[in-house]
Amino acid sequence: MTARIIDGKTISAELRGKLADEVARVVRDHGVTPGLAVVLVGSDPASEVYVRSKHKQTKEAGMASFEHKLPADVPQAELLALIGQLNADPAVHGILVQLPLPKGLDSNAVIAAVDPAKDVDGLNPVNAGRLASGLFALTPCTPLGCIVMAKQVHASLEGMNAIVIGRSNLVGKPLVQLLLNENATVTIAHSRSRDLPALCRQADLVFAAVGKPEMVRGNWIKPGATVIDVGINRTPSPDGGKDKLVGDVAFAEAKEVAGAITPVPGGVGLMTVACLLVNTLRAACAIHGLPKPAV
């Protein structure tokens, strides 16, 4: 059998459409325009492209977009002072500091400085703790997108066996918490787990977020399982041309076994910005004491 392709382009477009409707309603009914501030330190080309995409999609959703660009050699104190200003700015409901930061800056201190109520990346330790405690929290965007995509295939994840390969603070750990909140049975694994293929073969849901190109092979997949590939890896093209993007899953092999699978590119990556905007709207509503939006 050939797996159903879970199309990130279509799903993210639908989500952004619903989001724009909710933003328009909040603006109309409550006079609140959600605002997202993005802080870019240095001039990393990939980060600049990502920030431009965020700005464009933020405006298209009807939100206010604020960009702050700082040189790579900015002192830590100056960066923290900017975050303090954004924390106090009533027009800003979401703050995202583009990672990774240049050498010499303490990422943990910067993340901790963002007001948890405006931490739309969901990385502040307060939000991580709230999520682990089953309380309302702004959640990292990529895990949020993974859940949305899994629910395109399964109306409920309750009782399903899920494996998360990868234990990062950005994806693996929060994804485990979200799956537990959905009443899935979760195994968390990583590159040093023993007999990882056997663990994968038991899973109805496979989430690969380990950062190793095509590590998860087709014969690791349980027939009919749903595979969500978070990896984005550049590998040399066999013909010497441009590098190609591949995931953490060997797509050509896995799609012959899985029931549904996300492609790379065109999968989870497209959901990340859409979920960032969802978090910004949720933050704006929470800050103003409004009901949780319907997205």
UniProtKB/Swiss-Prot annotation:
Gene Ontology annotations for the cellular component aspect, listed alphabetically: cytosol
Alphabetical UniProt keywords: Amino-acid biosynthesis, Histidine biosynthesis, Hydrolase, Methionine biosynthesis, Multifunctional enzyme, NADP, One-carbon metabolism, Oxidoreductase, Purine biosynthesis
Chain positions recorded as NADP(+) binding sites: 166-168, 191, 232
EC number annotated for this UniProt entry: 1.5.1.5, 3.5.4.9
Reactions accelerated catalytically: (6R)-5,10-methylene-5,6,7,8-tetrahydrofolate + NADP(+) = (6R)-5,10-methenyltetrahydrofolate + NADPH; (6R)-5,10-methenyltetrahydrofolate + H2O = (6R)-10-formyltetrahydrofolate + H(+)
Listed GO MF terms: methenyltetrahydrofolate cyclohydrolase activity; methylenetetrahydrofolate dehydrogenase (NADP+) activity
NCBIfam families: PRK14186.1, PRK14188.1
Family, as annotated: Belongs to the tetrahydrofolate dehydrogenase/cyclohydrolase family.
HAMAP family in the cross-refs: THF_DHG_CYH (MF_01576)
Stated name of the protein: Bifunctional protein FolD
